[in-house]
Each structure stands twice: as C-alpha cells, then as structure tokens.
Amino acid sequence: MGMSATMGDSASIPGVFFADFGPAPPEITPEGYHEVELNKTKWVLPQWYNSLKPLGEGAYGVVCTAEYEPTGDRVAIKKFFRPFQSTIHAKRTYRELKLLRTLQHDNVLEMIDVFTPDPDASSLNNVYFVSVLMGSDLQNIMKIQRLTDEQIQLLIYQVLRGLKYIHSAGIIHRDLKPSNIAVNERCEVKVFLSFSQLSFLILSFFKILDFGLARAQDAEMTGYVATRWYRAPEIMLNWMHYTQTVDVWSVGCILAELVSGRPLFPGDDHIDQLTKIMSVVGTPKEEFWSKIQSEEARNYIKNRSPIIRQDFVTLFPMASPYALELLEMMLILDPDRRISVSSALRHDYLREYSVPNDEPVAMDTVINSIVTIDPAEERATTLSDWRELIWNEIRLFQNSARRLSFVSCTDTEEEPMKI
C-alpha cells in the first residue's frame, strides 16, 4: 500500500517514467558467470572475477574488489543500484557509461571492463563497471604520513596533468578533493571522476546535459556541488557562470594541505567556509563585488571589515619558495586572475617532472562524443529505449581493444617512488 502511494506520487513527475524494476532475473546463473553474495548484495559476475571483498557504497552503486584471474590483478567493480528505477536513473547510467568508455588518460581512472549477466536488451537490469584498483587515495595517505616535497611535486603534477586532459574534453571536475585522487605505492595518480558532480564546458552548445548536476557552460550553473573544504568560492557565491579554474582552487587547497599537514579551510558551514577563506586570502576589492550574482552573498562581503591577505611564508613555514609561489597563484579569490592548469604545469615548482610534450589532451573524437547527443538518445523516452542504448554501449566497449587491456603496475623497469 505504502509502495503504491510512493510510486503514484513519483509517477506524476512530467517526462519521468518509473519501472517495476523490469523482468525478474533468471533463476539459473548464466553460463560463464558465477553468483556471489557480499554484504547482502547478490553479484553475478564472469567466472574470471573471484575473491570479492567489499570496498564501499555510494548513492548510485556498491563497489567491491575482485581478483582478475588471468593476471592475478585486483580490480574494483561497481554494481549499479537499480539503474532502471526510472528514466532519470537510466539516463544517468547511460551517460556515465558513454563518458567512461570515451575518456582515456594515464591520470584519469578509467573503465577497463563493463558487463551484464542479462541475456539481451529487453531483460537488461544489471550493469557492472570495472576499473583498475589503486592502492589507496590521497586522503588516507595524508592521515598516516607526511609526504616529502619531491613526492608532493610529483602528485600535484599528475593531478594537473589529468585535469588538463579533462578540461580539454570540455569537462569541469567540480569535486576534486583528496578522497577523489587515487594513488598507488609508486606515487602514480589517477583522478576519479565523481560523475554526478561533473560540469560540461561545451562552447556554442546550449542544450543542458543532465549528467546528474552537470550542465552545459551556457546554461545557468548550480552552486553547492563540491565538498565544502575544497570548494571554490565562486561556487558558494552563486555566480551564474564559473570556469575550469574552480578545479585550480581545489588543487591549491590540496597542495596547502600537503605542505602543512592540515586542511586549509575546514568550514563548519557555507558562511564559516567563506569566512575562513577570506581570513587567509583577504576580503575582495569593490570591483569584484559586481561579479557576485547572489545579493545575500554580496551584502555579506560588503558589510565585513576589510581583511588583509595573510603572508603565505608565515602561514606555510614548511613550504619551499616555489610551492609558496604556486599556492599564491592558485588561491586567488577572483577566478579571472587565478592561474590556469596549463600555466600551473609550467610553474618552476613542478619543473623536475614537467614533460610538455607528454601532456595529452582529448582528441576531437572524444570531444565530439561528449558534445554530440545521439539521435537515439534524443528519441529515448521509455525504459525500453534506455535499455537498448545501454545494451549497445556495453557491446561497443566489449568489442573494443581497450577491454581488459590494463597493465599491472609491476610491469615497469623504472624504480618506484615509495609512499
């Protein structure tokens, strides 16, 4: 009775169709697959994925680790929660799959496999993504040890290198934080794309792309999307438009935490966050006020007593001169004056690791795949339509050379930098 009422209320949303979760799953495990129950969740996987262990759970799926039997490598597998609960859920699953199938970069966490145990598009109800399993994330590493300046340089360089690729594809990350930066013991970095937080910078393309909270550049952009401590102030100040430099601010916050050993702006709420930011970078000048769309935020800043920008040498006594200089350029309140990712990659602080001719950007085919809305997607209105689209994406990836083409981190001749 309660469920009927809920479904009835939900079904009143215009243009959104809810499902009965599709046909019942087959009682017999498909040939070539095996069934595992983990934390009360049923996993049906190809037989080459074994030794499952729980890893985490998010809003849209649950993640475990598994051993890929042919190589012995550990991988991470994400099972989507009810991807066909509604057309909104199905669309999100489709676009995440399409995006991850398209992006490919050393410093961006990639999808290496996707599968379903379901036999055809009409019965599609289960979707699994597979990625390389990195040893840890930056948040956990910072909890247990202080990194050397050399390690910090290498980490920040790789994060910026990944961002250069992401930005070139027309994407703003918006959720960059230590827990979204995967790191292995060789100090190799992969940026995790928190899909629902991405924003898409699509020039001359005015259609809103509904990737969760993601929007086209020329549509109004929503605030409050990133984790607060690493969130650029222009997002909190509710500007109509913001740019890729929101990610540079986040990198600056991460760099500051790496050199000082503590979060730079640990705000308790949005007002406290803004107060902490201005206590370090100072209150903005009057010409900056006109850029703030929110009247409440504008009045809040106007009515504050002027604060002088802190001396970063005093604030970060353990930081090298070049690290301080880069921090000064990243942590600027006005995004129009903030250093870009490309310029940051050329900064003297990262000189030892900088290889300008080995900083790939997205190819036109990648950009076109992200920008272009497939006519079939435009026509998709029912869950059956979305099942067909997702089924085709799964088959496209499974027929690609990239499937399970990952290389073990141990297959290298270079001496590792230990963390």
UniProtKB/Swiss-Prot annotation:
Q: Which reaction equation describes what this protein catalyses?
A: L-seryl-[protein] + ATP = O-phospho-L-seryl-[protein] + ADP + H(+); L-threonyl-[protein] + ATP = O-phospho-L-threonyl-[protein] + ADP + H(+)
Modification Phosphothreonine, positions? T222
The record's principal subcellular location, in a coarse class, is cytoplasm
Described by its record, this protein's role is as follows:
Responds to activation by environmental stress and pro-inflammatory cytokines by phosphorylating downstream targets.
Q: Which residues form the Protein kinase domain?
A: 49-350
Binding residues for ATP: L55, G56, E57, G58, A59, Y60, G61, V62, V63, K78
Task: Name the Enzyme Commission number(s) assigned to this protein.
Answer: 2.7.11.24
Q: Which residues form the active site?
A: D210
Q: Which UniProt keywords apply?
A: ATP-binding, Cytoplasm, Kinase, Nucleotide-binding, Phosphoprotein, Serine/threonine-protein kinase, Transferase
Q: What protein does this entry describe?
A: Mitogen-activated protein kinase pmk-2
Alphabetically, which GO biological process terms does the record hold?
A: intracellular signal transduction; response to osmotic stress
Q: Which residues carry this modification: Phosphotyrosine?
A: Y224
